[in-house]
Amino acid sequence: MSNTVATMINKRNIMRNYIKIGVAGPVGAGKTALIEKLTREIASKYSVAVITNDIYTQEDAEFLTKNSLLPPERIMGVETGGCPHTAIREDASMNLEAVDEMVTRFPDVEIVFIESGGDNLSATFSPDLADVTIFVIDVAQGEKIPRKGGPGITRSDLLVINKTDLAPFVGVDLSVMERDARRMRNGQPFIFTNLMKKENLDGVIGWIEKYALLKNVEEPASLVR
């Protein structure tokens, strides 16, 4: 994370005491699983709320209600009714209203996760909606995914490459993915995870604490640049 990004976060938080973390990525990559695992680990330490986006349903919100440790009233589903790009970028009004409602309901909130609907590699968040962004891809999509680029790969503040346990079953060389991610990310961090077993989940939490919450902690060793 650059000093520019840290300065930007500080400026945005002058009038509020919470951070907005956008989580995007293709369908099935592990966005909801990441938020579920994160909230289980950090809910006892931080005040957390979640906004999910689905086109026609509230399936992700319902999953988190059943599986995370957050009470149902801290999880809100937004039905976008159209392209998931629009709801997080060109016209983020529904999500901004959801965030406002959530932080009004819970004035102590410190972290608001905003999960986009499943998308391709071009998803980006409006800077008004997300202070920092995490983009999730998975090994099962193939080792060529990092080198395909797209804003999600190249511009997100943290890239999560999930489902590393599937690599031998889908013929993926993780070293190739690492090489290509290094090249495409140009110094920005990424991390390999197996969220089913919580492998390197602590690294994602460490990144959030250091670069989103701006805590004075060491950079996680599992981050790759």
From Swiss-Prot:
GTP binds at G25, P26, V27, G28, A29, G30, K31, T32. Belongs to the SIMIBI class G3E GTPase family. UreG subfamily. It comes from Haemophilus influenzae (strain 86-028NP). The keyword Cytoplasm applies. It comes from the Bacteria. SUPFAM superfamilies: P-loop containing nucleoside triphosphate hydrolases. This is Urease accessory protein UreG. Facilitates the functional incorporation of the urease nickel metallocenter. This process requires GTP hydrolysis, probably effectuated by UreG. InterPro entries: CobW/HypB/UreG_nucleotide-bd, P-loop_NTPase, UreG. Keywords: Chaperone, Cytoplasm, GTP-binding, Nickel insertion, Nucleotide-binding. GO terms for cellular component: cytoplasm. Its main location: cytoplasm. Homodimer. UreD, UreF and UreG form a complex that acts as a GTP-hydrolysis-dependent molecular chaperone, activating the urease apoprotein by helping to assemble the nickel containing metallocenter of UreC. The UreE protein probably delivers the nickel.
